[in-house]
């Protein structure tokens, strides 16, 4: 049986990366929330 999580660095950064977040208004809100919370890492 094939496992559901097949890691790929490229796919990961394209969907959850910093530039993907900055591309949309809501993504920027995500980053702002994480900055406000004091997250060490903002995005993948």
Curated annotation (Swiss-Prot):
Coiled coil: none annotated. It comes from the Bacteria. Pfam families: Ribosomal_L34. InterPro entries: Ribosomal_bL34, Ribosomal_bL34_CS. One of its GO terms (cellular component) is ribosome. GO terms for biological process: translation. Keywords: Ribonucleoprotein, Ribosomal protein. One of its GO terms (molecular function) is structural constituent of ribosome. Belongs to the bacterial ribosomal protein bL34 family. This is Large ribosomal subunit protein bL34. It comes from Actinobacillus succinogenes (strain ATCC 55618 / DSM 22257 / CCUG 43843 / 130Z).
């Amino acid at each position: 049986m094939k496992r559901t999580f097949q890691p790929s660095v490229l796919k990961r950064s394209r969907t959850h990366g910093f530039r993907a977040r900055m591309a949309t208004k809501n993504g920027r809100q995500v980053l702002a929330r994480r900055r406000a919370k004091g997250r060490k890492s903002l995005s993948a």
